[in-house]
């Protein structure tokens, strides 16, 4: 799922982990952590060719959560970047071209957010955001702190998006068409 990743384990079999605790990190960018989605015991660290980590299996045994400091987007790029790296959310930022892990040391010119899904039978964006509108707006504001340019939010025509006026550098674009109209290559200039 993460092109260019060379994983280095942060846990061993038998270790107890909390949800949000690091399981492994990237060899190239050691500050990029991949965290556990659940609390439990590490049952297996499976390896593939050339001893690369293919999966880390955690048997769930509770609801313990790693406590993280959440940065306010107004705190600037460094505060937001530190939160994304510590929480394990940074790996979901993709660097173009080639859809590789983003380099945390590089300030992106622009950031593109696909707030739409053109895949067959995909749910409507409004349903996914229902009750989470404020979280989406704060997320866009946080992404705005990471870039020196704009945060381009792409959505389908007629889609109700949360108010993004608090993010000065957010720009909403409307796209339509057959799948894959929502993919990054189509969004970027």
PLM features: residue spans?
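Short hydrophobic beta/alpha edge segments that flank linear recognition/processing sites
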Residues: 14-32, 46, 54-60
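Short alpha-helical basic/polar micro-motif
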Residues: 15-19, 38, 134-141
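Buried, small/hydrophobic-residue-enriched core segments of structured protein domains
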Residues: 46-189
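Short histidine-centered loop motifs in beta-beta connectors
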Residues: 6-16
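Alpha-helix N-cap/helix-initiation motif
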Residues: 6, 29-31, 129
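Structured core elements
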Residues: 8-10, 24, 33, 57, ...
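Short beta-strand-turn/beta-hairpin segments enriched in glycine/proline and small hydrophobics
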Residues: 1-4, 25, 32-36
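Structured functional modules or segments
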Residues: 32-43, 48-50
């Amino acid at each position: 799922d993460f092109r260019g990743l060379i994983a280095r384990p942060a846990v061993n079999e038998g270790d107890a982990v909390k949800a949000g605790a690091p399981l492994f990190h990237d060899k190239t960018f050691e500050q990029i952590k991949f965290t556990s989605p659940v609390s439990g015991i590490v049952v297996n660290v499976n390896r593939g060719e050339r001893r690369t980590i293919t999966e880390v299996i955690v048997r769930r045994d509770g609801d313990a959560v790693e406590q993280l400091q959440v940065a306010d987007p107004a705190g600037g790029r460094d505060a937001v970047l530190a939160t994304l790296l510590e929480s394990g959310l940074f790996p979901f930022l993709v660097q173009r071209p080639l859809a590789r892990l983003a380099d945390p040391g590089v300030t992106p010119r622009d950031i593109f957010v696909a707030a739409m899904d053109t895949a067959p039978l995909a749910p409507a964006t409004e349903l996914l955001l229902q009750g989470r509108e404020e979280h989406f707006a704060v997320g866009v504001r946080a992404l705005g702190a990471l870039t020196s340019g704009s945060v381009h939010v792409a959505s389908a025509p007629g889609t109700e998006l949360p108010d993004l006026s608090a993010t000065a550098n957010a720009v909403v674009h409307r796209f339509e068409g057959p799948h894959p109209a929502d993919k990054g290559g189509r969004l970027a200039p």
